[in-house]
Structure formats: C-alpha cells, structure tokens
Amino acid sequence: MPDPAKPGKDLTAWKKKKQPVHRTVSQICPPPRRPLTVVDIRTGMENERLGVVRDSMFQNPLIVKAELGKPRERSCSLPGINFNYGLYIRGLDGGVPEAIGHWNVFKQQPTCPHELTRNYIAMNRGAVKAGLVTARENMLYRELNDIRINDQEDRRQKEPPPIPPNMTFGIRSRPSTPFFDLLQHRYQQLWVQEQKATQQAIKMEKKQKVILGKLYETRSSQLRKYKPPVKLDALWHMPHFKKVASHLATFPTEADRQRALKAHKEEYAVRQGTLRMGNYTHP
C-alpha cells in the first residue's frame, strides 16, 4: 500500500525551479534618454496637447512636464553616431598606415609681409655728401633715394665662445674613496699636525711680544687717582619726633624680649604646614 504522505511530495517534485534572471547590458546601463517627440506622445500623458503640436515644443524645458513615475525628460538632443567625444587630432586621423607610411611634417606658415623701416642715418649721410641742407632738399632726396633697413642685417650671427680644450661637460664624477688613507688614519694624523703647527705659531707669537716690567705706584700717580671722600649728610628728621619712644612695650626688659624671640625661632618648624601643626615625615 502506498503511503498517504507520499503523493504530496510527488506533487512538489513536479514543480519547476525558477531559473536565475540574467539582465542584459542595456538593462543595467540603459541608453541616455532622448528628448520627446510627437510620435512618443500617447493619450493620457502629461505632455498631451491639443491643436498644432511640433517637436520643438517638447524641447523647451519651460513647457515639458515630468511624467508620473518617470524622471523628467531633458530637452537636449544628443549628437549622431558619427560624433566623436573628446579632442580630435587632425595630425593622426590616418591611423596606423599613415603613422608607418610617412613622417607627418607640418609646413611652416608664411609670415605676413611688413613694411621695412627707413634708414634715416644713411639717407642723411648721403644728403650731406650731396650738398643738400634745406628741409625741402632733404625731403626730395629721401623720395628719390629711399633706403630701408633690412631685417637680416640686424640679426648678427653670434659665434659661440671659445671652449677650453680640457672642458668637461656635465657633472663631474666623485673621485674614488682613498681606502688606504682611511685605514692608516691619515686624515687624523694631518689634523693633529695642523693643530700642533697652530699651537707652535701661537707660542712663537707670544715670545716675540715685548714683556713690559711691572709698573710701581708712586706718590704722584696715587695722588692723580685719589678721589676725596664725600661726606653724606644724615637724613632730616622732624625735631619733635627725635626723642619719642615706642608706643607699645609688651616686655618688661630687653632680656625678656630676646628670650621670647629665641623661643619663637625654636618653635618655627612645629608651626609650619597647612594646619599649622608642623611638617613631619611619617614612616
């Protein structure tokens, strides 16, 4: 006898499994939205109009309305298929055959001709040699003998400066490290010798100096430097305060006062601290 629970399992086995949905590139990255046209308008849309309708009316951003549930249409039309985005280089428009076949040489553009300036120095020199002095004679001479300054004459070819035969171009290479001098402490020995020579020169310079004898002070030199002492006057006090004693005397005698000061100094350490109970270091 078949189990009554098996028919339910058999029915579920006949159900087809859902295949995974593969999206195309156009679905993942849809093409850019183009501006609306009259053909795209259907009944019930927001941009449906009555009367004469032209495509240019749907390219005006002030007139076009946003459709329900869709992004707003832009009225900017895209260029055609043959349009290249970016910089177009005309020198490389032939591709690989043109690059391999010949060199791309740009022709020099012809310079625009300009009027040459007059050479007044040469014309004045010629007029003086011809004996012309007045302004009218000079003007007529310049009309007959119009001398111009050539641009090629101003461009003097400067010769390069003479280069010495032992000239080295570029950065000179670092000389090789003298390992033998480093191992022998040659630089240390040279430094010690220089220090000794410097000390010897200082000693010789001190010996060459004339050592003067001790100068003794005489009575005349002492009188020359003597300054008489200035007697300072005592400070002035008011006469009726001279013999006034202290107003308050708490000690009967001076001995008692000194004894109290001594006891105060002995108790000075005990009366220190935040609570005036002394400073002590507890173990």
UniProtKB/Swiss-Prot annotation:
Q: Name one Pfam family in it.
A: CFAP77
Subunit (UniProt): Microtubule inner protein component of sperm flagellar doublet microtubules.
Q: Out of the domains of life, which is the source?
A: Eukaryota
* Similarity comment: Belongs to the CFAP77 family.
Naturally occurring in which organism (per UniProt): Mus musculus (Mouse)
Q: Does the keyword NAD apply?
A: no
Question: GO biological process: what's one of them?
Answer: flagellated sperm motility
Which gene carries the instructions for this protein?
A: Cfap77
Q: Where in the cell is it found?
A: Cytoplasm, Cytoskeleton, Cilium axoneme; Cytoplasm, Cytoskeleton, Flagellum axoneme
Q: Specify the protein name.
A: Cilia- and flagella-associated protein 77
Q: Which InterPro entries match?
A: CFAP77 (IPR029147)
Functional summary from the UniProt entry: Microtubule inner protein (MIP) part of the dynein-decorated doublet microtubules (DMTs) in cilia axoneme, which is required for motile cilia beating.
Where are the residues of the annotated region Disordered? 151-170
For this record, an example GO cellular component is: axonemal B tubule inner sheath
Q: What is its main location?
A: cytoplasm
Q: List UniProt keywords, sorted A-Z.
A: Cell projection, Cilium, Cytoplasm, Cytoskeleton, Flagellum
